[in-house]
Amino acid sequence: MHLPVAWSRRRPSSPRSRRISRPQAACLSGLTRKLARAIREGIRPDGSVIGPPMPIPLYRGLSDEDVMSMVIDLRQVPAVENDPGESRCDVPLPPSYSPPVESASAPDRGATVEYGAYLAGHMAHCIECHSPMGPQGPMTDTHTVASGFEFHGPWGTVISPNFSSAEDGVAEYSDEDVKAMITQGLRPDGERMSPPMPYANYARMAEEDLDAVIAYLRQLPPLPDGAGLE
């Protein structure tokens, strides 16, 4: 999937995460539906569109059950009164990210390629960060996990590595190596991986889910780093 907007190789500047905890005085009528719509369709309660880096094109495939689980968790977050200010997006945003999502389901859970694709795409959006950037956004359709996405932060500049089935990708690692990188942020040589790899968030992934993600990665076409992009 691609964002229907023009991207640069760097993220649009000044995106600010919005407060999503529940103030005591807030009206809860329709909150579940509004949160689900914001997550899966990128539409705020006031009708405005949420921009990058929120991976709406991938979240559109989240199952109804998984979206509801997220909403339930968010509604249990302690109340926080905070105004982060307005986000500023340097690219034009579409009026919407396509038609409303009426309903979506996930593949049956198991150590399968299909379920791994769901986890690596819609749930964890691994394929966004590990795919090179094109003019329409991360090239997740044609250059899936071929590396090349640049991240700029306090750590400097990090380029996401190749995780296709190429020899310089996932093929050179054992399943246990890949699991350690995903859940602990440790390379086979023991070196710590750089931010923004969110391994702390993946630390509690079930073994079966990790097996599914690895099965998915190993069947992807082998692509060179950056898939030959300049």
Identify the function of each model-found stretch.
Residues 1-2, 35, 70, 116-119, ...:
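The canonical Cys-X-X-Cys-His
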Residues 1-15, 42-49, 77-81, 121-157, ...:
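Periplasmic/extracellular electron-transfer cofactor-ligation site
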Residues 9-36, 57-67, 143-181, 199-210:
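Electron-transfer interface patches adjacent to heme c in soluble/periplasmic c-type cytochromes
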Residues 73-75:
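Short helix- or helix-capping micro-motifs
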Residues 82-92, 229:
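Extended, well-folded interaction surfaces typified by the phenylalanyl-tRNA synthetase beta subunit core
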Residues 94-121:
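Electrostatic cytochrome c docking/interface patches
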Residues 113-127, 140-145, 173-179, 194, ...:
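Sequence context surrounding c-type heme c attachment/ligation sites in exported
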